[in-house]
Amino acid sequence: MERQCSTKSQSWCVRTAEDEENNFMMICRKGNVYELMELAPFISVDGHLLHKYDHRGRQCIHMVALYDRKNAIMKIEILVNMGADINARERNTGNSLLHIAVKTKNYELAEWLCREPTVNLGAINYEHHTAYHMAYYLHDEKMKELLITNRAVCDNPEGIKMSEDDISDFSSDN
């Protein structure tokens, strides 16, 4: 499906729906905050890209949390204002943004998410693990304390079995 650019100044404008998706995901992953802000009026009108999953089962909001530690909070705020779901789950793992923050050891993002009133602090992924369970099995004392302090769901994971594969999945970029 061809798209036409309305002005020459819209250098991000692309020719096909696939190119559009790839460019948007790339800006979410590696672009700067200003590039994302420039897209806001266009994406907000037709928000399908905000909810589209890539081949790894991730939406744009997951890409930001995984790959742009420095600007994650600002970009996530912009995406949510455009209509992205702050509680969206990765399709393949069921991980939430809070799970991703634990996995990437992004303490600033984790604390910010815990303070956002609409974030589900008790989200459970497809392996039945909360973000706290991940921090527990990764032996990340700083993250565990952050989650406890900010009232995330921190039930005792002792009775929950976790294999070595599950633990390695936390630290790999599947």
UniProtKB/Swiss-Prot annotation:
ANK repeats lie at residues 56-88, 93-123. InterPro entries: Ankyrin_rpt, Ankyrin_rpt-contain_sf, NF-kappa-B_inhibitor. Keywords: ANK repeat, Host-virus interaction, Inhibition of host NF-kappa-B by virus, Repeat. The keyword Repeat applies. One of its GO terms (molecular function) is NF-kappaB binding. One of its GO terms (biological process) is symbiont-mediated suppression of host NF-kappaB cascade. Pfam families: Ank_2. Suppresses the host immune response through NF-kappa-B inactivation. Possesses ankyrin repeat domains required for NF-kappa-B binding but lacks the regulatory regions required for dissociation from NF-kappa-B and degradation. Therefore, prevents host NF-kappa-B release and subsequent activation. Belongs to the polydnaviridae I-Kappa-B-like protein family. PANTHER family: NF-KAPPA-B INHIBITOR ALPHA (PTHR46680), NF-KAPPA-B INHIBITOR CACTUS (PTHR46680:SF3). This is I-Kappa-B like protein C1. It comes from Microplitis demolitor bracovirus (isolate Webb). The gene is C1.
